[in-house]
């Protein structure tokens, strides 16, 4: 791939990520789904009620909807690193719980197929222990309600 087309590919991937943030905040999960392969796999490490491996649109979609309950994001403070068929995004977010609002950086590692669709996603919070704590507090609060 020549340098110009590599630059264009990187710009497309970055633009799609930014567009997906907007879709995430608007709860337009169909728009996010269109950027993924039907057999997409998403991994979220940790010990929270959301951690695990999700496969396919339906499972990944349920995880994205659940993340929307606790994450706040905008288009600022994002950096991109490209390595072959993957893009690593460092993204500042807020995680909300019943008694918490914490800022942290989320690393999103996305791998792409030849058509430019996302085939795998790994979400890595900078402070996994705090991330899990806030998510589990949300679960406890919803169970108590």
Language-model regions: role of each:
Residues 75-81, 93-94, 105-112:
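Hydrophobic/aromatic beta-strand elements that line small-molecule binding cavities or substrate pockets
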Residues 55, 107, 123-124:
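Residue-level structural signal for beta-strand termini and adjacent loop
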Residues 1-34, 38, 138-145:
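Short, low-complexity N-terminal intrinsically disordered segments enriched in polar/charged residues
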Residues 69-70, 95-103:
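Short, cysteine-centered beta-strand-loop-beta hairpins and adjacent loop/turn segments enriched
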Residues 20, 32-36, 40, 60, ...:
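Hydrophobic pocket/interface hotspot
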Residues 120-145:
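Low-complexity, intrinsically disordered terminal/linker segments enriched in charged
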Residues 30-84:
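A solvent-exposed, acidic/Ser-Thr-rich amphipathic alpha-helical stretch
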Residues 53-54, 99-102, 129-137:
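A short, polar/proline- and glycine-enriched secondary-structure boundary/capping micro-motif
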């Amino acid at each position: 791939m020549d340098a110009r087309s590599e630059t264009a590919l990187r710009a497309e991937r970055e633009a799609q990520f930014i567009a997906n943030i907007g879709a995430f905040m608007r709860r337009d999960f169909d728009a996010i789904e269109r950027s993924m392969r039907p057999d997409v796999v998403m991994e979220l490490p940790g010990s929270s009620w959301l951690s695990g491996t999700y496969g396919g649109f339906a499972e990944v979609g349920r995880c994205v909807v659940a993340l929307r309950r606790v994450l706040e994001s905008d288009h600022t403070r994002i950096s991109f690193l490209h390595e072959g068929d993957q893009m690593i995004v460092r993204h500042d977010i807020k995680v909300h719980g019943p008694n918490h609002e914490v800022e942290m950086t989320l690393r999103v590692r996305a791998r792409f197929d030849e058509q430019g669709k996302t085939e795998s996603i790994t979400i890595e919070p900078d402070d996994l222990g705090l991330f899990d704590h806030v998510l589990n507090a949300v679960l406890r609060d919803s169970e108590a309600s």
